[in-house]
């Protein structure tokens, strides 16, 4: 009560921020007559003037009034569009490291030109981030004339572009691209083998469009660059045949309940749990199929990978539905983004889930991948010196923006008051009744010429509504992930009188729905339109526009509530843009996922008390409130998941930053010999310590062990026992010095053969390759640690603290391994004289010719001795990466001679 009273007196924080900014808007408006007097050349010259002032030490914030006035004037001259006062407010919010909530149709794209221009004056680059390539390209091309008029360069960063083109795009003053592409470029830059391969500059200012979609909805999805792991596609197919034999039960087994089924599904956490009965059946089926031996347990350590396959297959069948979570197109399983309804080409689920879905759908199973580099959007965007974003719906997530990204949310007022009517929700008992009511509503609305937009939460639901409309003889358009290409054209004409459009989640669609349809689209369809044709099209559009307004504007129908209120608000926000008339209503049923999981008991109890008949709906503020509470529950749960993810990823992030900064330092220097020498000392000291403990008696020394270790690990054959016999005065310290000196001498002899420059280049390559290889293995180990760490909670230990502690010791161990492996590889490398190389090459060519001749012989006579010899030659077993190395060192092949291949 007191807070409400204080807010009334002093205004909310949002009001105070806007009040402060309005004073600056007045200054900008006062400058307008002065700017209008400038010639085009003088207006362009302002950019150079601002840059000169910044170089002399003026603060960027001092330039705001003048810079914004310049952009507004340039926009009037180039586009014939003048920034509204609210757009100037939005521009200032975006410059202050804040999130600007601006309603749909308020001109976010034009608003973004203000802070983009201001921050580009520093010369450090501005990244404008969009949700898809189409929007990045569209916004870049639309705004290019304005920025180029003001003397700034514009770049577009698209997937698949060659490195030189990307480098050029990043070198521009303002770069447009998608969140995925910026993140992947960052990871690729940190896997480069020379400074020239890197494309990004230092991350300075990011301006994120649809910021809630990118920083919240996609925050749980890490960006991963992966390489192929071993092939296990056959196992996915074999395990997939077993799953259809299992029966689902409604509840999980407990002390009070024992079900008849084999597994239960927890829809809230999207997990599948096997029951005791299910485990027994699966083990029987695995034995019957010959996958597992009789008497073995699925939980034994030897079957850990098999358990992984069973879990993945069970999740694929029980949790993932075709045309909801993914579509199958051209024999490929493509993920559908649950938040935007778009397909995510090239993205794959990890942990074998994608392969399990491919096996379920009977398409070709692609190899599993191993993570080479990964980062979450949360951590990528926090790398920027300055971050800001804009969206139509941020206020519901203001707390999350503030606590994770340290970004305040400012709600920017609309240019004209909002007059859309948001009608209360209607709740039906069954899905069929709800769909029927939606069809009736559409019939009523279209009969009076009102356009209707129907929002669904999955492709499956959009096709269900589409089929019902077809049966009812209502003409309509469908916009979902399957019909991606016609997207902009369909949305542009969704405001046509009596038009019916069905769309999956509308987030980030980026095209305004203009009442009466888009006259620009009609003009664009003509080849060479005359002025008369354009005037006629505009006049016809005005008639349609007025008719639609008369009918009540665009009507929005939500076929069910989404988990997040924000996405419902995005759907509503398509109507009532720029003060237009409009209306919206959500239709729900007790069979909807959200109602079933979170709100069923209270609402169905209410419905029973009211004695509802089939086809009747309940419409009451209490119901709407109960649903809003259910959504709040889901939102807070999702927030907790994202926060947890971030807390764990922060540990990996500190390590990632350390590795990447080390790697960049390595890339930028040409001579790493000093580092190599320092590492060599550490490695030899630790190696000798293991066999000659410091300050110990000679009886405690293990000289044969040391000699063998030096030979195996560093290819150093030293007669240490002989030295000690012949030189009694040789003590521990001088012995250590001699071993190190010998290793340096052998290394220097190699350097003399190939030359210093070649050796420096080789050293750098070995360090980079070893670092990348160990980092890749460390990432996999961190993944395994992360998956099982929650079990420490049962031992009364804090899983987060345990994760931090263990991952730190793993990181320290990795850095030690790095030293050993670098020195080991450099010590074992065989250096040849040029004439020796020539001789070996000659031998290799002769051997190749001999094999080719033998192959010809084997074609002529399969039973010949030559064919047998060839078979023996080619049938030699290939050593697996994880097998013991044939050299007898006791190490895995990949960590010994396999590394040198």
Swiss-Prot record:
Record key words, sorted: ATP-binding, Cell inner membrane, Cell membrane, Cytoplasm, Membrane, Metal-binding, Nucleotide-binding, Protein transport, Translocase, Translocation, Transport, Zinc
Cofactor: Zn(2+)
CDD domains linked to this entry: DEXDc_SecA, SF2_C_secA
Induction, per UniProt: Repressed under conditions of excess protein secretion capacity and derepressed when protein secretion becomes limiting. This is regulated by SecM.
Chief location category: membrane
Binding annotation for ATP: 87, 105-109, 512
This enzyme's EC code(s): 7.4.2.8
Compositional bias ranges of the Basic residues kind: 891-901
Annotated region described as Disordered, given as residue ranges: 859-901
MF-aspect GO terms: ATP binding; metal ion binding; protein-exporting ATPase activity
Record localization: Cell inner membrane; Cytoplasm
Catalytic activity: ATP + H2O + cellular proteinSide 1 = ADP + phosphate + cellular proteinSide 2
Cited SMART domains: SecA_DEAD, SecA_PP_bind
Residues binding Zn(2+), per UniProt: 885, 887, 896-897
Pfam families for the chain: P-loop_SecA, SEC-C, SecA_DEAD, SecA_PP_bind, SecA_SW
Cofactor note (record): May bind 1 zinc ion per subunit.
GO CC term, one of those recorded: plasma membrane
Zinc-finger listed as a keyword: no
One biological process term in Gene Ontology: intracellular protein transmembrane transport
Membrane topology designation: Peripheral membrane protein
Family: Belongs to the SecA family.
Task of the protein: Part of the Sec protein translocase complex. Interacts with the SecYEG preprotein conducting channel. Has a central role in coupling the hydrolysis of ATP to the transfer of proteins into and across the cell membrane, serving both as a receptor for the preprotein-SecB complex and as an ATP-driven molecular motor driving the stepwise translocation of polypeptide chains across the membrane.
Subunit text: Monomer and homodimer. Part of the essential Sec protein translocation apparatus which comprises SecA, SecYEG and auxiliary proteins SecDF-YajC and YidC.
This protein's name: Protein translocase subunit SecA
Source organism: Escherichia coli (strain 55989 / EAEC)
Lineage, highest ranks first: Bacteria, Pseudomonadati, Pseudomonadota, Gammaproteobacteria, Enterobacterales
């Amino acid at each position: 009560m007191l807070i409400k009273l204080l807010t009334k007196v002093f205004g909310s924080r949002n009001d105070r921020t806007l009040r402060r900014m309005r004073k600056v808007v007045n200054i900008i408006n006062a400058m307008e007559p002065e700017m209008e007097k400038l010639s085009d050349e003088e207006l362009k010259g302002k950019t150079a003037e601002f840059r000169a002032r910044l170089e002399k030490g003026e603060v960027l914030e001092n330039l705001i009034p003048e810079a914004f006035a310049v952009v507004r004037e340039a926009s009037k001259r180039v586009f014939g569009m003048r920034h509204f006062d609210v757009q100037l407010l939005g521009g200032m919010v975006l410059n202050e490291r804040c999130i600007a909530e601006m309603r749909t149709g308020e001109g976010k794209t034009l608003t973004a030109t203000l802070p983009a221009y201001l921050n580009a004056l520093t010369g450090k680059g501005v990244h404008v981030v969009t949700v898809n390539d189409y929007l990045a390209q569209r916004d870049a091309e639309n705004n290019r004339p304005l920025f180029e008029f003001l003397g700034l360069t514009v770049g577009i960063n698209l997937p698949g572009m060659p490195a030189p083109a990307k480098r050029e795009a990043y070198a521009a003053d303002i770069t447009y691209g998608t969140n995925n592409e910026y993140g992947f470029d960052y990871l690729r830059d940190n896997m480069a083998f020379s400074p020239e391969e890197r494309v990004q500059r230092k991350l300075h200012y990011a301006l994120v469009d649809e910021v809630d979609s990118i920083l919240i909805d996609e925050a749980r999805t890490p960006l991963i660059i992966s390489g192929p792991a071993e092939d296990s596609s056959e196992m996915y197919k074999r395990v997939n045949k077993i799953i259809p034999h299992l029966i689902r039960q409604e509840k999980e087994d407990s002390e009070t309940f024992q079900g008849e089924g084999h597994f239960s599904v927890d829809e809230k956490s999207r997990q599948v749990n096997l029951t005791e009965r299910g485990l027994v059946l699966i083990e029987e089926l695995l034995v019957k199929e010959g996958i597992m031996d009789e008497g073995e347990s699925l939980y034994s350590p030897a079957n850990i990978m098999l358990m992984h396959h069973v879990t993945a297959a069970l999740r694929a069948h029980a949790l993932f539905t075709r045309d909801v979570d993914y579509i199958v197109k051209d024999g490929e399983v493509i993920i559908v983004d649950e938040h935007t309804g778009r397909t995510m080409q090239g993205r794959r689920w990890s942990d074998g889930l994608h392969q399990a879905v491919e096996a379920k759908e009977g398409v070709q199973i692609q190899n599993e991948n191993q993570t080479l580099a990964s980062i979450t959007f949360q951590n990528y965007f926090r790398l920027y010196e300055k971050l800001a974003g804009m969206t139509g719906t941020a206020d519901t997530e203001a707390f999350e923006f503030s606590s994770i990204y340290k970004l305040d949310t400012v709600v920017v007022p609309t240019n004209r008051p909002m007059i859309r009517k948001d009608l209360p929700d209607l709740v039906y008992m069954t899905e069929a009744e709800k769909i029927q009511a939606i069809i009736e509503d559409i019939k009523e609305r279209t009969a009076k010429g009102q356009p209707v937009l129907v929002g669904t939460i999955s492709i499956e639901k959009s096709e269900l509504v589409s089929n019902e409309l077809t049966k009812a003889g209502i003409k309509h358009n469908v916009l979902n992930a399957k019909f991606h290409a016609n997207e902009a054209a369909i949305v542009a004409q969704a405001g046509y009188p009596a038009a019916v459009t069905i769309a999956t989640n509308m987030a980030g669609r980026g095209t305004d729905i203009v009442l009466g349809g888009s006259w620009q689209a009609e003009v664009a369809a003509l080849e060479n339109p005359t002025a008369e044709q354009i005037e006629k099209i505009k006049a016809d559009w005005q008639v349609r526009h007025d008719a639609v307004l008369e009918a009540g504007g665009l009507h929005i129908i939500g076929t069910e509530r989404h988990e997040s209120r924000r996405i419902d608000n995005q759907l509503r926000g398509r109507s009532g843009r720029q003060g237009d008339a409009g209306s919206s209503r959500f239709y729900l049923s007790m069979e909807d996922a959200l109602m079933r999981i979170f709100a069923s008991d209270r609402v169905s109890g209410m419905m029973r008390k009211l004695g509802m008949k089939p086809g009747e709906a309940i419409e009451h503020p209490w119901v709407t409130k109960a649903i809003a509470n259910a959504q709040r529950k889901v939102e807070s749960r999702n927030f907790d998941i994202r926060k947890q993810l971030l807390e764990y990823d922060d540990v990996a992030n500190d390590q990632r930053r350390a590795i990447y900064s080390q790697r960049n330092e390595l890339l930028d220097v040409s001579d790493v010999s000093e580092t190599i020498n320092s590492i060599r000392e550490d490695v030899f000291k630790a190696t000798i310590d293991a066999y000659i403990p410091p300050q110990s008696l000679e009886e405690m020394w293990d000289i044969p062990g040391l000699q063998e270790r030096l030979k195996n690990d560093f290819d150093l054959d030293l007669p240490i026992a002989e030295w000690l016999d012949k030189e009694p005065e040789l003590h521990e310290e001088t012995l250590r010095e001699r071993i190190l000196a010998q290793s340096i001498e052998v290394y220097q002899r190699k350097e003399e053969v190939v030359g210093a420059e070649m050796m420096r280049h080789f050293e750098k390559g070995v360090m980079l390759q070893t670092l990348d290889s160990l980092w890749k293995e460390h990432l996999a180990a961190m993944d395994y640690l992360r998956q099982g760490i929650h079990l420490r909670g049962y031992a009364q230990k804090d899983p987060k603290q345990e994760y931090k502690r263990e991952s730190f010791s793993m990181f320290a161990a990795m850095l030690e391994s790095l030293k050993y492996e670098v020195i080991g590889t450099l010590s074992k490398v065989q250096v040849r004289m040029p004439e020796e190389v020539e001789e070996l090459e000659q031998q290799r060519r002769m051997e190749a010719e001999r094999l080719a001749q033998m192959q010809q012989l084997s074609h002529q006579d399969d039973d010949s001795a030559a064919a047998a010899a060839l078979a023996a030659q080619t049938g030699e077993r290939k050593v697996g990466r994880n097998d013991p190395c044939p050299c007898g060192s006791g190490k895995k092949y990949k960590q010994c001679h396999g590394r040198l291949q």
